[in-house]
Amino acid sequence: MNCSKIIPPILRLPAKTFALGVLSLSAFADAAIEEIIVTSDFRDTALLETPASVTVFDSVVIAQRQARHLEQVLNLAPNVNFSSGASRGRFIQIRGIGERSQFIEPLNPSVGTLVDGIDFTGIAGAATTMDIQQIEILRGPQGTLYGANALAGLINLRSNQPTEQPQGNMQISLGDYDTRTVSAALGGPVNDSLGYRVAMQKHSSDGYMVNDFLNRDDTNDIDELSLRTILDWQANQQLDFKLILFHVDADNGYDAFSLDNTRHTLSDTPGHDRHKATAMAVESRWQDAEN
């Protein structure tokens, strides 16, 4: 008689498992999933609706990687590779197509690089991640929108835009090899129709190479300054204008080769990788009043 009241443990396990499953589904249902918007198609499109193979990295991923340059994020994307040939990765390949160096064909970049709509194709050394909101990597031909420079794909960097409320941040970081980074950004409204955002970043490092011939440890150094200003003018309810000013000044060393593949070199005349660029862009958008 007593044996008939004993419930085997195996009968209780499915009930507990089912209860846990219900709780998990409920938790997922309550959690809001943020929608990712892609801007590379000249219009804001949800990632799931974009007719291309796209990888998007937001500011959270960039911060987690402590990335100061595009090259420090590219290796997270599938089917994307890059080579340096200088202090920074500037030759990018998507699905095996693209420049490998400045001396090997094809000399056509094939992979477009845009920073806030400004074309830096072939000179991706200027693509710092200063105040970047997200990085979009489009795999496959994008020639219809961007021409011959995007036959293999496109990399689009979009910075943080002016906000309706005052907003700012500042970061100071220190690291090994005398690495120092100072960055700051400030934005907000000027009046009801005009907004602004300014950002700067100064990044320097001695590098991890030691030149035994010259008895120096800074021949592969990094010294980069980036500045950006965005003015956003809402002319009326349908028409919007943006003025984008961008400046980058890089004076980096280049002393990376050694016969025994160590961090020690014997170069008597180390190289330099200097890059200075100033760019401006004007962007306008019209939105139909019915939308």
Model regions and ranges:
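Short acidic/polar hinge/loop motifs at secondary-structure boundaries
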Residues: 102-103, 110-141
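N-terminal periplasmic accessory domains that precede
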Residues: 70-71, 91-93, 114, 137, ...
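Transmembrane beta-barrel wall of Gram-negative outer-membrane proteins
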Residues: 167-169, 174-205, 209-252, 278
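Transmembrane beta-barrel architecture of outer-membrane proteins
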Residues: 65, 89, 110, 152, ...
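N-terminal periplasmic "start-of-domain" segments of outer-membrane beta-barrel proteins
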Residues: 34-65, 73, 90-93, 110-111
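Extracytoplasmic loops and strand-loop junctions of Gram-negative outer membrane beta-barrel proteins
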Residues: 137-138, 166-169, 210-215, 262-268
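Non-catalytic regulatory/gating segments with a bias toward low-complexity or hydrophobic composition
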Residues: 54, 62, 74, 135-140, ...
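Extracytoplasmic beta-strand/coil segments of soluble accessory domains associated
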Residues: 71, 75-118
